[in-house]
Amino acid sequence: MADRLKNVLQQGIYLLAAHPNWRESRVNRELLSAARAAPGVTVQDLYGRYPDYDIDVAAEQANAAAARLIVLLHPIHWYAMPALQKLWIDEVLTHGWAYGAGGDALRGKDLWLVATTGGPESSYSPQGYNSHSFEAFLPPYRQTAALCGMHFRPPLLLYGAHTVSQQAIAAHVRNFEKLLESHPHWPARENLDAYPGYAVPDGDRPYGSGSGSGSRGS
């Protein structure tokens, strides 16, 4: 037991939870509670911590740099992450820190998406009303990880969060807890190749080397 606890405490997991209304949450609220109870996990409730959207960039960078695994926990809103989670990425993952020349603070770390959808799994198919599999909506997450030299780990999803049974939610939470506890010893972790990184010219950052992600235009 002592050895297992020591292993968990050394994991260095930073979990970013983003939900605009926790009172209406059926699944993410349970996952948040489980993460808060897990040893070795630092939890940041973004909407609770930054209700005015004024993110403490230095503190967030310190937390992210100290972690081996960064978890993005949120519902999918219009095929993407909630607004405050996107703002966190824009402001915290700066050029020269997270990517670009000298930007290696996150290199080699894992990025893990833990997400819920309102629609059932059947809706995420060419025949469903979302027209695509969920995989089709993952490129922004994957490329964010790649640009920062991180490993994007297979997402943990729960479809149909509004209607799924309590038994299914409980099983999902248990699986989430086991995965948190077992990191970094996840299947195939040792087979991951290091990302080569990307040389982003300073001139491509119109706001200077301290600006956020490459998705930000003029």
Task: List PLM regions with ranges.
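Generic recognition of short, well-ordered alpha-helical segments
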Residues: R26-E30, I55, A83-L87, Q167
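Hydrophobic/aromatic beta-strand patches that form the interior of the parallel beta-sheet core
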Residues: Y14-L16, Q44, V71, W112-V114, ...
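N-terminal beta-loop-helix "entrance" segment that forms/cooperates
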Residues: V41-A65
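N-terminal beta1-alpha1 ligand-phosphate binding loop
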Residues: A2-Q44, E177, Y198
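Short, conserved loop/helix-junction motifs that constitute active-site signature segments
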Residues: V8-L9, G103-G108, C148
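Helix-loop-strand module that forms the ligand-binding subsite of alpha/beta enzymes
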Residues: A58-R142
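Glycine-rich phosphate/pyrophosphate-binding loop and the adjoining helix
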Residues: R142-S218
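Short, solvent-exposed amphipathic alpha-helices that sit
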Residues: R26-A37, S133-C148
